Amino acid sequence: MVRVRADLQCFNPRDYQVELLDKATKKNTIVQLGTGSGKTFIAVLLLKEYGVQLFAPLDQGGKRAFFVVEKVNLVEQQAIHIEVHTSFKVGQVHGQTSSGLWDSKEQCDQFMKRHHVVVITAQCLLDLIRHAYLKIEDMCVLIFDECHHALGSQHPYRSIMVDYKLLKKDKPVPRVLGLTASLIKAKVAPEKLMEQLKKLESAMDSVIETASDLVSLSKYGAKPYEVVIICKDFEIGCLGIPNFDTVIEIFDETVAFVNTTTEFHPDLDLDPRRPIKDSLKTTRAVFRQLGPWAAWRTAQVWEKELGKIIKSQVLPDKTLRFLNMAKTSMITIKRLLEPEMKKIKSIEALRPYVPQRVIRLFEILETFNPEFQKERMKLEKAEHLSAIIFVDQRYIAYSLLLMMRHIKSWEPKFKFVNPDYVVGASGRNLASSDSQGLHKRQTEVLRRFHRNEINCLIATSVLEEGVDVKQCNLVIKFDRPLDMRSYVQSKGRARRAGSRYVITVEEKDTAACDSDLKDFQQIEKILLSRHRTVNNPIEDDSDRFEEFDVDSQMEPYVVEKTGATLKMSTAIALINRYCSKLPSDIFTRLVPHNQIIPIEENGVTKYCAELLLPINSPIKHAIVLKNPMPNKKTAQMAVALEACRQLHLEGELDDNLLPKGRESIAKLLEHIDEEPDEYAPGIAAKVGSSKRKQLYDKKIARALNESFVEADKECFIYAFELERFREAELTLNPKRRKFEDPFNYEYCFGFLSAKEIPKIPPFPVFLRQGNMKVRLIVAPKKTTVTAAQLQEIQLFHNYLFTQVLQMCKTGNLEFDGTSNAPLNTLIVPLNKRKDDMSYTINMKYVSEVVANMENMPRIPKDEVRRQYKFNAEDYKDAIVMPWYRNLEQPVFYYVAEILPEWRPSSKFPDTHFETFNEYFIKKYKLEIYDQNQSLLDVDFTSTRLNLLQPRIQNQPRRSRTVSNSSTSNIPQASASDSKESNTSVPHSSQRQILVPELMDIHPISATLWNVIAALPSIFYRVNQLLLTDELRETILVKAFGKEKTKLDDNVEWNSLAYATEYEEKQTIIVKKIQQLRDLNQKSIEDQERETRENDKIDDGEELFNIGVWDPEEAVRIGVEISSRDDRMDGEDQDTVGLTQGLHDGNISDEDDELPFVMHDYTARLTSNRNGIGAWSGSESIVPSGWGDWDGPEPDNSPMPFQILGGPGGLNVQALMADVGRVFDPSTASSSLSQTVQESTVSPPKQLTKEEEQFKKLQNDLLKQAKERLEALEMSEDMEKPRRLEDTVNLEDYGDDQENQEDENTPTNFPKTIDEEIEELSIGARKKQEIDDNAAKTDVLERENCEVLPVAINEKSRSFSFEKESKAINGRLIRQRSEEYVSHIDSDIGLGVSPCLLLTALTTSNAADGMSLERFETIGDSFLKFATTDYLYHTLLDQHEGKLSFARSKEVSNCNLYRLGKKLGIPQLIVANKFDAHDSWLPPCYIPTCDFKAPNTDDAEEKDNEIERILDGQVIEEKPENKTGWDIGGDVSKSTTDGIETITFPKQARVGNDDISPLPYNLLTQQHISDKSIADAVEALIGVHLLTLGPNPTLKVMNWMGLKVIQKDQKSDVPSPLLRFIDTPTNPNASLNFLNNLWQQFQFTQLEEKIGYRFKERAYLVQAFTHASYINNRVTGCYQRLEFLGDAVLDYMITRYLFEDSRQYSPGVLTDLRSALVNNTIFASLAVKFEFQKHFIAMCPGLYHMIEKFVKLCSERNFDTNFNAEMYMVTTEEEIDEGQEEDIEVPKAMGDIFESVAGAIYLDSGRNLDTTWQVIFHMMRGTIELCCANPPRSPIRELMEFEQSKVRFSKMERILESGKVRVTVEVVNNMRFTGMGRNYRIAKATAAKRALKYLHQIEQQRRQSPSLTTV
């Protein structure tokens, strides 16, 4: 028979606040919670739950809620609080309110009509009731603050409740909620307490509920075995320590001296006493508590520490003397103790000098020694130690650790203990570096404890609370627990079954300890008896529970396929596990919601159960148990089993019956997540990443490949018509040469083709004569050529490429005139006739050239030269070559001008030679014969063959142009002659003079020469455009099923244009963010100048790669990347922040010098020295109402007083004065509240009592304060608990006069669980009935949705999402008339222009005039949007976690890469710069070697693996075979404990990324990264979207293989209203419920704010429902809508930015997009439109978060200054475990904003234009602000902030959640981590964190400039 442990058999409990709220709605309840821990939450949410009745009009049955407070000053405070969180109108009433309430009942009624909730003082409410202005039955909720006052028989609370009870007998009465601080004082006798609690319950007619975190711990925590060990007292004086008296005397005298000295003026001197007092205090405390050995050790530490302070900086003499005095005291104490202590080398020797508690401690530990367990305890399997030892003081923790380490080294039997310690930060100042270090150390130690690397943790109370520690089996309370909290918390840490909880106590404390523990246990019982979760019981009071075998009650569930079996006894645990795996934020624990239903069968009570899973689970309906069970527990188990069955059928549990958790998803994400751009060796590049590159063949267009011309067959003539559209830039033409427009030439070049070639767009090339537009024009008539002509043409063609263009120099090409050449068109010179635009081949010219085809230059014989006569005509438009120079590399010159006045005898422009004659004779031994010839002024012909880009003058020319020039270049002629000279490029404005006689004239004229130089660029571009035209045709046919793909004769494509083509354009594309800012500030002229300069500097590449940190870059710039990494590693973290400071060094056991900072005093000495300003912690002690003084103006209301921790000094006088000021009644009114002046004027009969109370309170507090201060002096390092429970002593409030009527009312404390279940369900039913009957406004069915006038705005209509973009030019135009042919949605015309397709295929690496980046940005966001839309509508019941995963898979780079590869995209991509000499194959040439490099072996295999993963198959883990390459890489990647870590080593990268690891054939192959292919796919999507509009694009995406919904596919959108709760008797239950929610959360009001009226209201309700709100079963939660809205917003905003007339460059576009599409912005907008008031949630953590955030936003006045901290604030999706308190932005708020966008999109029938109108209305200000002052990405900003010293050092992936954590190191010793869904987010978060911290430091520096001078 299976015995079931009861505690494993309950569903995970809800948050206690939610539990309380649930009870409070169903029955009258008194909630007792400390300040801040959620009373506010419960009150406000209770009011919201009654919203339906409150918002109903008063005359139609609406009710009112009253919030009754004790003191006037609380009225406003509570009212403000309620207003922040709800849409209620809140009225305030107290004695001084002047509203005419009292004048007449009408006035009062008017007031009630206007306000839903009234916050009122008790006396006023009583008066209103007594005067019959108000009736209790018209209220629906009555909340009493500080309800313990009701014990006073004369108190108005009591009087109101008396009336209430009388009414109760025959009228409906409101729900009562009493709020009070904790009623359990540790020192109250339990019996007495019980009696008082009952009294209070009776007075308030309510039940006290004791749920709290503490009680939950008692209830659900483990029950360890408790032991008290009594030890001998430790009296330090009786140990006979040598020199004992001297030591004590030194302590006393030094302390007295330090305390009484008046040497230091508080404002003028550097006061060193803090560290000195600390050193004395701690050493003395250790001496007294742990004995001389520990004190000896501590003294050493301090000696060193003080020494460090003395050396650390220049200090004034007086200060130094003081420090030295202290150091001497320490040395003396050390020396006095040393002789004896040094000898100790074993635990026996130590025994006499330590308390017995320590020895006992070691005895307990010894029982965990594996040998001891085997031999003495006869255990088979040793139990591993996992212990926590709690001590009160930080120093004791440290000293114990030292002792343990030494004993471990002395005694082999303790070798198994691995101790460490953990303490909290004292100061609350989290920005200080030491508490950061401390926090890091704490997390690190706890992580090692989790992994069992440490098995014994010594801790202060910091671990009792909050910090999650794994289960341990031994908890030792070294100092006995002094209060209930400490007892329960520390006990709750022993969670493992069978663990022990040991308290060590000395004999003198035994009695006290004993009675305390008894009380604690009694009180625990009382508390538990009042915290019953009846629907999820732990205890079962039905009899017969133990008697039978649970599993026999119901058949187990078996999965046939795998044989997995689930029994009843394990079902609950599985459901708990499933719920915890559902997506939720960090504040929300999703738990199942169970209800037990008692049923009478033949007089026997049996039980059914009903289970609701969290609302984001696909199973939305209640799971009901059909057959009743004999008791409650089994009913729970049975319903859980049924739920598991349904979950398995839904596919939520896999066939092994395990939740399909995030682990498997994380595993997959690992393959597809984008990877770090940091360098880490040995990590194989992932498929789809930019690191993984492969080789692909280059492709030649079909038309050019098949154009081989045969003799005597007809062929087409194609002419290259060049037309100049712009003169050459003056900078490029410094000598002001005149050029003719080639359009006017009588001849041009063209080529012959056997086939017709498709029309392609004209395109620009940039020649010396200016910028040309090239058109490919077909001659009207075909032609034929004879075999002889063909041969001549081939020779001519070959001549052009070899002789003129010098292409075959390297011998890698050979001419092939057959059809084998990949590109086989022949180039011919053409004559053109202007009149009819006809072209003919100029054979005469061909023959001439071919006839003169010798190797140029020809060297004339001497006699020929003597005959030479100069003829100017020969040199016009000629190309000349000097023949007396290097003939290997001939140099060609254009003759620019003939200089008739220059002769060879003219003066030579260089001092070394007199004349030209002399120069040539001396230099070349050449005599010039014709002395009458004119000289020539010439220009270089450039060998730059890439003319695709505008010419940029200040690029140094290739040296091959002028390898060894000896032209007489003035003034450097001689200099450039020597071979070594590097100045061979003459400055372009200097003239170059040549002598005609020494020249050879080239047969080809200069004008044609220019055109020939353009041929490679022209052919290269024509090929590209033809290829993209083929792609266009493929898409038309395959994606759109079009027959016709050819262009008609009368239309042509618009020409290919670059962004940089015109200067006008240059102002349009905004490149750098800085520029964008200037554009908005400076005048436009400056702007143009600046942009122009920018454009000249960059070659199109540099400005785009913004923000990628590459260590190599740094090295290049000369930054030293240092390798100091010694800050926080190893043992040196040991003493971090023990008091507060970091240090380096290592603790070794033998080393006597213990480096150990007790306080970072140096920081203290230089930091703020004004007493109070330095207090950092602020824990208020006085309960005021219930806020932690969250009064109206916290800044100027004085804090009650603060417990001081942290670095500040203690200014006792100031403190006492403060306490006096706050608690002196005569001044209290003015200080406690600025709003109410006379707080004590209230009906007179209470005055005296209140004053007495105040007086008493005041004296108590003063007394407390004094005690505290003394205690503080005594032991400042006692750790404080995180928060102090407020408690109320009920005795103070009761009085002896018992009211008579109380006797008659029996206490209503239900006796059994069944009775309570009954009571709760009746309460719930009643409320439901009233809700349903309350009048509803605005619940009519709506015909259609509409955008309200407030949101209508012309600017949002500047473009339409349904149509193509206005910003795109590349359409069809009517031939020559330049008029656009437009095409509408259904008619896609002829597809996308080849030039746009080409842009979409050109990477930025190609350094061309265009790149795909802008298209890629828009394509990326449209792809995300389309995929999301598809997934949302196809996976209808999947929760957001699975949707997100499916989306990441679909849009991942590896998926796009795989699709792109299938479509052959890589062969079309332009990935490298055009280099005519190396990587271009000219027409009619073939490479001389046919070598082709293969791809790496595993490339194929990896692609296939990814293919399998993306198809959703299971991945089998392959053992990776290590190659020699991987060995080095092992270190960088490791997986432990569910975290995979990749460390990026510090090293400069060697070599260049772009270089392939293997040689490959440049002519036929290209090397492209996977990511470029993915980018190109996105860019193609983008370009189709912008040219054709969205619907055709979806067809194209479908053709690509992406999953999208097509326009014409009708997708059934199920109604958002879920109808599970409808029943035959109540068919409209769900609609009614929706109406209730609609009214309760005031959604009509919200619609007005956002400017949109919903047709389907359920969408809006769903958009506001948080997963924690279990009551809404009619819509589901917002997670799916958020998933959709996220993509909708992203796409709309990106598209809007894209359409902006300022045409942002890709970098800016991306930055603006990430600045606008992020959680922080969305959350602030949500708060701006008060979404939080309509938020449907039950989640305390989130509630407090939102409250803080709303305050933050209103302080900033809702302005989104992107560069302010606001943009830096962290949202919860970015946070790391254990750092929850860092969050400032509640992600939920951003999520609602996104889900509202999703809701509008769906409600408007998926209409983006409508959605954009509404969203633009909300975001307009933000968007405009952002564009005017764009933020920089945090990564970039960090790089600039600390340029030299930033390094991203490692990345970890948490496998459970799939999140990524990235670490960044700044200035070597500061580390910040960031979390995120993927690497990119995490990296940005880490950068944000670092920046935030650096900004803080910066600010502190600015604020205290005077202090840095010390």
From Swiss-Prot:
The segment(s) forming the RNase III domain are 1381-1589, 1643-1805
Q: Which GO terms describe its biological process?
A: apoptotic DNA fragmentation; defense response to Gram-positive bacterium; gonad morphogenesis; miRNA processing; nematode larval development; olfactory learning; pre-miRNA processing; regulation of development, heterochronic
| Consequence of substituting G492R | In mg375; defective avoidance behavior in response to P.aeruginosa
Q: Where is this motif: DEAH box?
A: 145-148
Stretches of the chain forming a coiled coil according to its record:
1245-1280
Changing E1682A does what? Severe reduction in both dsRNA dicing and DNase activities. Loss of dsRNA dicing and DNase activities, bursting and protruding vulva and reduction in the number of cell corpses in embryos
The UniProt annotation places ATP binding at L33, G34, T35, G36, S37, G38, K39, T40
Please name the top-level EC class of this enzyme.
hydrolase
UniProt superkingdom: Eukaryota
Site entry (Cleavage), positions: D1537, G1538
Q: What is its EC number?
A: 3.1.26.-, 3.1.21.-
Q: Where is the composition biased (Acidic residues)?
A: 1288-1304
Region annotated Disordered, chain positions: 951-988, 1227-1248, 1272-1309
Task: Please provide the record's keywords in A-Z order.
Answer: Apoptosis, ATP-binding, Coiled coil, Endonuclease, Helicase, Hydrolase, Magnesium, Manganese, Metal-binding, Nuclease, Nucleotide-binding, Repeat, RNA-binding, RNA-mediated gene silencing
- Here the segments flagged for biased composition (Polar residues) are 970-988, 1227-1245
| Segments forming domain Helicase ATP-binding | 20-201
Helicase C-terminal domain location: 371-542
Q: Output one GO MF annotation.
A: deoxyribonuclease I activity
Biased-composition ranges, Basic and acidic residues, are 1272-1286
Q: What else is known?
A: The avoidance behavior is transgenerationally inherited, and thus progeny display this same aversion despite never been exposed to this pathogenic bacteria.
Name of the molecule in the record: Endoribonuclease dcr-1
Kindly list the organism's lineage: Eukaryota, Metazoa, Ecdysozoa, Nematoda, Chromadorea
Give the gene name: dcr-1
